[in-house]
Amino acid sequence: MKKTTLFVLSLLFISSLNAVDGVSKTDLSSLSMAEDSVPLNHSNAQKLSLKNAWTRVLSSHEGLHAQEYAIKRASKMKLAAKLSFLPQIDLSAFYVYLSNPIKMDFAGQKQPGVQKATNQIHQGLQNIQQNIPPQVLTPQIQAGIQGVMQGFGALSSTLESPLLFSKQNVVIGALSIIYPLYMGGARFTMVRIADLMQKDANEVYRLKKLSTFQELVSVYYGMVLNTEVAETLEEVEKGHYKHFQNALKMQKVGQIARVETLGAQVAYDKAHIASVKAKDVLEVSQLSFNSILSSKDDLAPSSKLEIHTEKNLPDLSFFVSSTLNSYPALKTLENQIQISKENTKLQIAKFLPQVHFFGSYLMKQNNSVFEDMIPSWFVGVAGRMPILSPTGRIQKYQASKLAELQASSEQIQAKKNMELLVNKTYKETLSYLKEYKSLISSVELAKENLKLQEQAFSQGLSTNAQVIDARNTLSSIIVEQKSVAYKYIISLANLMALSDRIDLFYEFVY
């Protein structure tokens, strides 16, 4: 009997030692995990509101800068189109070296005829001189006849030598002007097309601006969501750790079994892992936030996931009309229709005549007969009427008309799609708002339930699993509510961007 009693006492003593040892091991492992848990710290980060962040994005986003350059480029092209009404003035210079001088050899080509004509002139003058009575032939008349004969002799010798028209070196300069008087309306059409292209560049910039705002809202409130979720999970981790410590104390005094303590430890371990993952996600969102702001310093949002639940959205018709009247993509399609019409006019101009005024002032050396023959200046008018052309003018005209119909059909379909998208986004926004409001009471209920379960557990009226379930339920509802708030904000931003009413966004979000 004594041996049996001693054996039972020894078993109880050993089991008590094992329990104490298990409690100490569990306590040490949990303490090490608690030490590894790094608390959130954004105190050193610069806080930015959404408006301030948007201002920084407008000044530093390279995508927006690229579209600004596109607008400036379109403006230059518009000015270039207007300059087509100016005349074209060119200053040209020519230097030509001829293989041989330009000359005419009368003696070689017409030598017999020239000699015969010269002889006949001499013979005629001699006959005149012989037939004149001596009393009439005065010294003056005789001297005149001799002069004429000498002149014809010189002419004969001149005709017998080559006549030089131009030397081998020819240098000519010209100041020329060409001014189109009528081009079939092509120049006016090109100016209107350039103006439409500039408007289109402005609409592309507006579209890029709206999409960048949507991206900023997504990144900004994405970081807010990740921050608040990480804070919530950190609080859950602390709550599980506190509950685990209470379970350890109650196990030591024998109020609960070790399996209850192990359950509390498992819950704490899971909460710790979830908290670490949330912090990792937060670090990634921090990088995205710094990237969109083009900042190397750590920045943090100052806003919270809070929304104006008491403020009602405008009617759906307001957003639909605003979108159809001002959305940049629809404006771009409208510009494309106008550009297609102007292209049709440009194709028609190819069938019409063209009239040009031209003129030139020539600068020359005047050291040859050929250059002396060239006039110093000239002006004129030239016309051109295309009859047959291998460029496919008719087919290009037909293609431009088809482009008009294509752009018109795309605009009609785009308006239908945009109206459907606005309806969908509007209803999604209202749905998220209702869901957010409904979760407010669920959060209050979960908080009260956790409070009651913790009090009951401390009094031995509740189990460890009930406390853990109550805390996990509260955290899941809080995270769900924050996720719904984030979805509401993103949907609201999309709705405001579609209607080009970014200014209204700030009235519904803190």
Where are these regions (language model features)?
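Sec-dependent N-terminal signal peptides
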Residues: 4-13
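Hydrophobic, lipid-facing positions within transmembrane beta-strands of outer-membrane proteins
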Residues: 171-177, 319, 377-383, 425
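Periplasmic alpha-helical coiled-coil/stalk elements that build and connect Gram-negative outer-membrane
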Residues: 3, 21, 29-33, 40-41, ...
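Amphipathic alpha-helical coiled-coil scaffold segments and their short linker/junction regions
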Residues: 54-58, 110-157, 295-357, 505-510
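Small/polar (Gly/Ser/Thr/Ala-rich) solvent-exposed segments
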Residues: 65, 89-103, 158-168, 178-207, ...
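Acidic, low-complexity, intrinsically disordered peripheral segments
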Residues: 20-28, 33-42, 90, 97-127, ...
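Amphipathic alpha-helical coiled-coil segments
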Residues: 66-81, 208, 214-233, 242, ...
